[in-house]
Amino acid sequence: MTSITILYDTIRLEEKLLIESAKKNNITIEMVDCKKLFIDLDKNSHDIQTVLQRCVSYYRNIHSTAVLEGQGVKVVNCLNTGIFAGNKLFTHMLLKKAGIETPNATVAFSKDAAMKMFDECGFPKIIKPTVGSWGRMVSKINDMDSADGIIEGKESMHPIHHIHFFEEFVQRPPRDIRVIVIGDNAVAAIYRNSADGNWKTNTHLGGSAETCKITNE
């Protein structure tokens, strides 16, 4: 019987569906809470062979993957995928290299450079942390005063926040479309609708989701 370890830090619907699917396909699942896990880096003191990496935390995810891969464990997704997929700037450059259209983006490596960018490129801009999710620390900057305050605050945080990543503000209906792609095939999609008075569509911030039918478009 096939055996797979699911490494997690939060049990969500997706993990429950994976467990249910494993049972239907006669696959043994071992659930391991990464928050309770410690590993001797110099000894292979476990019998884990294949891991589905499901940690929500980016740093917990990539560091635990690095450890397990270093000990010969097959991890899905692999370390390289985890690093790139969890960083918006890295992902943007991969999409650009692949010829996939994305909102125009700019990066500045200091407050002075960021303010110069605003002076030359204008407003509005969306500022996002390169690492993060659920719409946290994502702001729409409309003028120099708000730019100065937001970037000044980020400069006092962890060095990851000193990488100032900006995207154009896309004028759209109060919804966007999130599509799941496997290989070259779009397999599922949802509409994400903004909550009243909020331009963000994150469901974590009050947005709502509904089914989006996959079409040739």
What are these regions (language model features)?
Residues S139-E217:
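Phosphate-binding site of ATP-dependent enzymes
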